Amino acid sequence: MSDEEKKRRAATARRQHLKSAMLQLAVTEIEKEAAAKEVEKQNYLAEHCPPLSLPGSMQELQELCKKLHAKIDSVDEERYDTEVKLQKTNKELEDLSQKLFDLRGKFKRPPLRRVRMSADAMLRALLGSKHKVNMDLRANLKQVKKEDTEKEKDLRDVGDWRKNIEEKSGMEGRKKMFEAGES
């Protein structure tokens, strides 16, 4: 083995060792975080949820249920209020970002997706298989027949300007122009 191969192998072995050491550290950190979250959860539950004491009589049990229902209602109201606030702020954020795009002159275009369905298949899917749908898009087009009009003939005649130039060029053309001018 040459020195270069030994160096390469040593470098790769060192890299592998460093990777494994980093992975071991990451695993221990994740385990510590999970344990900390569990402790935090237990503390929160102990703080916010009083221990359950079941009273002996039916009257006391009904009062406890009423208290719990009232607490559930208040929590639901808070949750609903926070959801409404979140929706408002999201809408406001979208409006502001749209204004920003408008001011910059850059419009965010949604990505177009290829539709692999023909118009007939799309209508069949929408209306169901009971309705027979045939969508001939050419049926509504206006029928146009090509006719030779005088304008087109005049345009073709004007298009023969090369012949007119050739006739007027040279001595013969000048002679014709001169003779036409005398008479």
From Swiss-Prot:
InterPro entries noted in UniProt: Troponin, Troponin_I, Troponin_sf
Question: Per its record, what are the GO molecular function terms?
Answer: actin binding
Q: Where is this region: Involved in binding TNC?
A: 2-48
User: Would you kindly state one Gene Ontology biological process term found in this protein's UniProt entry?
Assistant: skeletal muscle contraction
User: What are the start and end residues of every segment in region (Involved in binding TNC and actin)?
Assistant: 97-117
UniProt xrefs under Gene3D superfamilies: 1.20.5.350, 6.10.250.180
Query: Sorted alphabetically, which keywords does the UniProt record give?
Result: Acetylation, Actin-binding, Muscle protein
| Modification type N-acetylserine: residues | S2
Gene Ontology terms, cellular component aspect?
troponin complex
Q: How is it modified after translation?
A: The N-terminus is blocked.
Role of this protein? Troponin I is the inhibitory subunit of troponin, the thin filament regulatory complex which confers calcium-sensitivity to striated muscle actomyosin ATPase activity.
Subunit notes for this chain? Binds to actin and tropomyosin.
Q: Which family does it belong to?
A: Belongs to the troponin I family.
Name of this chain's protein: Troponin I, fast skeletal muscle
Name its species.
Gallus gallus (Chicken)
